[in-house]
């Protein structure tokens, strides 16, 4: 069966009107009316972002007290004044 574009459009419109009231309890009520925008309010960002969407930031370790290099976070070194120096410490920024 081969349909032209016009026939396809007419068929789609008829199907839309035929199934328009499937989810409603009364005539004219559709699934779009039932939602009352609750779905969109859930999607809005409220509070902190989701854990896997947080930005990763590099922190400067300068000024952190240490006794040996083991006390400093990775990629930092303990200098002669017993302070960690260098850029290090990737962490999730809240």
Swiss-Prot record:
Keywords, ordered alphabetically: Cleavage on pair of basic residues, Disulfide bond, Neurotoxin, Secreted, Signal, Toxin
Tissue: Expressed by the venom duct.
Record carries keyword Nucleotidyltransferase: no
A GO term, aspect molecular function: toxin activity
Residues annotated as transmembrane: none
Residue positions assigned to the propeptide: 25-59
Intracellular or extracellular location(s): Secreted
Domain of life, source organism: Eukaryota
Signal peptide start and end residues: 1-24
Description of post-translational modifications: Contains 4 disulfide bonds.
Any one GO cellular component localisation term in the record: extracellular region
Main location, first listed in the record: secreted
Domain text: The cysteine framework is C-C-C-C-C-C-CC.
Function recorded in the entry: Probable neurotoxin.
Entry protein name: Conotoxin Im026
Lineage of origin: Eukaryota, Metazoa, Spiralia, Lophotrochozoa, Mollusca
